[in-house]
Amino acid sequence: MAGVALKREGPQFISEAAVRGNAAVLDYCRTSVSALSGATAGILGLTALYGFIFYFLASFLLSLLLVLKSGRKWNKYFKSRKPLFTGGLIGGLFTYVLFWTFLYGMVHVY
């Protein structure tokens, strides 16, 4: 029975540096998608409620892609799934509005 490995039961040890690194990657992804979707909304000329709906759709799509990428072993990379869905959502909204209004003004106003 030398080929059978015993599965160790017990507490999981989590590296705090790895958790912070993963949070930084999530923040970078959320900021990048917010900037790109804001620029897209501005170029497309979306206004008012349609622009905000576009942001939340883009944010939901990013969250879905992050969940699919992390797979069933999400607990290997994160303490909970909540940061995948809500992490950086409000900060990303500010970035989105900045790019949205700037590109809308450059393309449709001037």
Curated annotation (Swiss-Prot):
Q: How does it sit in the membrane?
A: Multi-pass membrane protein
Q: Name one GO biological process term.
A: tail-anchored membrane protein insertion into ER membrane
One CC-aspect GO term: endoplasmic reticulum membrane
Please tell me where this protein is predominantly located.
Answer: endoplasmic reticulum
Task: Tell me if Endoplasmic reticulum is a UniProt keyword of this record.
Answer: yes
* Domain of life, source organism: Eukaryota
Keyword annotations of the record: Endoplasmic reticulum, Membrane, Transmembrane, Transmembrane helix
User: Where's it found, cell-wise?
Assistant: Endoplasmic reticulum membrane
Disulfide bonding pattern of the chain:
none
- Show which residues sit on the Lumenal side of the membrane: 45-50, 107-110
Bilayer-crossing residues are: 29-44, 51-71, 90-106
Q: Which residues lie on this side of the membrane: Cytoplasmic?
A: 1-28, 72-89
Q: Which InterPro entries match?
A: Emc6, EMC6-like
**Subunit description:** Component of the ER membrane protein complex (EMC).
Role summary = Part of the endoplasmic reticulum membrane protein complex (EMC) that enables the energy-independent insertion into endoplasmic reticulum membranes of newly synthesized membrane proteins. Preferentially accommodates proteins with transmembrane domains that are weakly hydrophobic or contain destabilizing features such as charged and aromatic residues. Involved in the cotranslational insertion of multi-pass membrane proteins in which stop-transfer membrane-anchor sequences become ER membrane spanning helices.
What is stated as this protein's family in its record? Belongs to the EMC6 family.
Identify this protein by name: ER membrane protein complex subunit 6
Q: Which taxonomic lineage does the organism of this UniProt entry have? A: Eukaryota, Metazoa, Chordata, Craniata, Vertebrata
